[in-house]
Swiss-Prot record:
The modification Cysteine amide is found at C10. Negative results: does not modulate oxytocin (OXTR), vasopressin (AVPR1A and AVPR1B), NMDA (GRIN1 and GRIN2A), and muscarinic (CHRM1 and CHRM3) receptors, and voltage-gated calcium (Cav) and sodium channels (Nav). Exists in two forms, due to cis-trans isomerization at 4-Ser-Pro-5. The conformer with the trans conformation is the most abundant (~65:30). 6-Cys-Pro-7 and the 7-Pro-Pro-8 peptide bonds are in the cis conformation. Inhibits the human alpha-3-beta-4/CHRNA3-CHRNB4 (IC(50)=15.7 uM) and alpha-7/CHRNA7 (IC(50)=77.2 uM) nicotinic acetylcholine receptor (nAChR). Incomplete inhibition of responses is observed for both subtypes, indicating a potential non-competitive mode of action. Disulfide bonds join C6-C10. The cysteine framework is C-C. This is Conotoxin Czon1107. The keyword Secreted applies. It comes from Conus zonatus.
Length: 10
C-alpha cells in the first residue's frame, strides 16, 4: 500500500 508523506501531502 502507498501512504503519502504527511506533511506535506495529506
Amino acid at each position: 500500500g502507498f501512504r503519502s508523506p504527511c506533511p506535506p501531502f495529506c
